[in-house]
């Protein structure tokens, strides 16, 4: 009996990863061949501003002084015609606050908020309170959005009322080290493959915290982001789905982000992801 049990466990341990790998590859290819090719062009760029849903792009910032002057000009050149930028300085110890104040004075689309250091979830909740948009987008302070990314994500939610959120397609910016180049392959192939495969189920499991768009009324319905969870993106994804909404993947909404280039930084990031997933399951 014990021998048969051990054999069954051995078969499962071998077959499960192989079976799941076959499924992810097959499903993602089906999505790419039969669905992704039918996606249209940007919709809202030629429309009058008053006919386009407003988007509040929230950017929580903690010690992003080295990145903001590079990232903000890209955000100001987005082709989507109706948006505001809300930068939330989460108690930064560098010159982040001074930078966002300077940009807010230079462009009326920018709102600068300041708070004591309370974490990303608290910063996003702060931004949600003042957001004027029908939709709220969340990106990281070091992220560079593709000029059409917001257009594609709004288009996805406008055409699909059952969805409460849509997540974009993160790509790695820093490729100067071997570790950085390895993560390019991970994000471009493995993570994209899994998101495409999950899309065939009708919903994906989690949004990407570096680039995502939510219906504002859905976020208010679920009470915003949980401030006691280490990975707010995993937690908010499950809150949205338990409230009865699905989540979409929009592969055309590209967003370039900085990733760890040292092993210790990568270890801390992946440990945080694992801890956040465990916290959400236990919750």
List the predicted regions and their residue ranges.
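Cell-envelope/extracellular polymer assembly enzymes that use nucleotide-activated donors
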Residues: 53-56, 84, 220, 235
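N-terminal membrane-anchoring/stem segments of glycan-assembly enzymes
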Residues: 1-49
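Short, acidic, metal-binding catalytic loop of nucleotide-sugar glycosyltransferases
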Residues: 73-82
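Short aromatic/hydrophobic "clamp" motif used to bind/position activated sugar donors
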Residues: 136
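A structural helix-start
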Residues: 61-69, 89, 93, 97
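Conserved donor nucleotide-binding strand/loop of the catalytic core
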Residues: 83-86, 97-130, 168-169, 197
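Catalytic donor-sugar/metal-binding loop of nucleotide-sugar-dependent glycosyltransferases
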Residues: 228, 237-255
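Long helical/loop segments within the catalytic core of UDP-sugar-dependent glycosyltransferases
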Residues: 116, 121-123, 147-230, 267, ...
């Amino acid at each position: 009996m014990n021998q048969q049990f051990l054999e069954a466990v051995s078969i499962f341990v071998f077959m499960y990863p192989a079976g799941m790998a076959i499924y992810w590859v097959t499903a993602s290819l089906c999505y790419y061949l039969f669905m992704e090719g039918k996606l249209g062009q940007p919709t809202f760029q030629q429309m009058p501003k008053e006919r386009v849903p407003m988007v509040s792009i929230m950017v929580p910032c903690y010690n992003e002084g080295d990145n903001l002057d590079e990232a903000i000009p890209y955000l100001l050149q987005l082709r989507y015609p109706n948006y505001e930028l809300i930068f939330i300085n989460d108690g930064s110890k560098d010159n982040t606050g001074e930078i966002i104040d300077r940009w807010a004075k230079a462009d009326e689309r920018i709102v600068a908020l300041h708070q004591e250091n309370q974490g990303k979830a608290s910063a996003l909740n702060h931004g949600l309170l003042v957001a004027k948009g029908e939709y709220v987008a969340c990106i990281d302070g070091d992220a560079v959005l593709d000029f059409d990314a917001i257009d594609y994500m709004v288009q996805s939610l406008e055409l699909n009322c059952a969805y409460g959120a849509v997540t974009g397609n993160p790509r790695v910016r820093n490729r100067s080290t071997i570790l950085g180049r390895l993560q390019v392959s991970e994000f471009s192939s493995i993570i994209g493959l899994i998101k495409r495969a999950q899309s065939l189920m009708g919903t994906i499991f989690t949004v990407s915290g570096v680039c995502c768009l939510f219906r504002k009324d859905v976020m208010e319905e679920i009470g915003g982001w949980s401030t006691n969870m280490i990975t707010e993106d995993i937690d908010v994804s499950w809150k949205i789905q338990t409230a009865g909404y699905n989540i979409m993947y929009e592969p055309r909404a590209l967003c370039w982000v900085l990733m760890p280039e040292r092993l210790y930084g990568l270890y801390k990031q992946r440990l945080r992801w694992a801890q956040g997933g465990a916290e959400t399951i236990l919750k």
